[in-house]
């Protein structure tokens, strides 16, 4: 099929991208740093659930969102990312952006960070790929610790605050279930409840992941804030899943295995995904 001149021109000025969620297959909190942040060691993995972002060049910046409760002002990471790209490159690039928000907020799935990374990628594409992926990764760390991860290929061991990214070979494709309770959790509040006086036997390197996979040091503090989360986890484990783990600072859990999700729970299925070099993420066909 041949494209018309108008279609070709329009494709140069607009782009539509998938913005994937992430889960933490393990998350170790090593300690609190002098700057007030926490030193982490975590295995990040992108999954096939996510948002959709549409970008179109225009003369002023605008952001709209399918979720009326999500702020679309300067506090939104999408606008922060666009303006960061403009300040770094000096380009007079303005965009009309629409966010089709499908991921729940305060779920530990990295939705906002993914949106920001996707925006940086889109800006670079619309500008003619004038900077490298490594530069985008470095810039992203200035506005969010989890943003650099999304410039890996989708599987990475992340350290520091999360911004130090060691890309890894893709893991085997795996079907999971994401279960999100009707409430979210504030990341700062979860970290505030960490108790370093209690000994923790979890290792903090990727090599030990095969020996003791799937742990999250933030679960205990999340359970202290919301005791019903522990009940939810135990219910999911008793339903037959091999693994049930909170992702990030919560409040969602990912489940692996052949269990059954209770009908009263809000849940959706997803799969591990990765991206190819010089391409952004896309969803995979459903696995059987």
Curated annotation (Swiss-Prot):
The reaction(s) annotated as catalysed by this protein in its Swiss-Prot or TrEMBL entry are:
4-CDP-2-C-methyl-D-erythritol + ATP = 4-CDP-2-C-methyl-D-erythritol 2-phosphate + ADP + H(+)
Q: Where does ATP bind?
A: 104-114
Gene3D superfamilies per record = 3.30.230.10, GHMP kinase, C-terminal domain
A GO biological process of this protein is: isopentenyl diphosphate biosynthetic process, methylerythritol 4-phosphate pathway
Question: What are the entry keywords?
Answer: ATP-binding, Isoprene biosynthesis, Kinase, Nucleotide-binding, Transferase
Pathway listed for it is: Isoprenoid biosynthesis; isopentenyl diphosphate biosynthesis via DXP pathway; isopentenyl diphosphate from 1-deoxy-D-xylulose 5-phosphate: step 3/6
Q: Member of which family? A: Belongs to the GHMP kinase family. IspE subfamily.
* Function noted in UniProt: Catalyzes the phosphorylation of the position 2 hydroxy group of 4-diphosphocytidyl-2C-methyl-D-erythritol.
Q: What is this protein called?
A: 4-diphosphocytidyl-2-C-methyl-D-erythritol kinase
What species does this protein belong to? Protochlamydia amoebophila (strain UWE25)
Q: What is the lineage of its organism?
A: Bacteria, Pseudomonadati, Chlamydiota, Chlamydiia, Parachlamydiales
Q: Which gene encodes it?
A: ispE
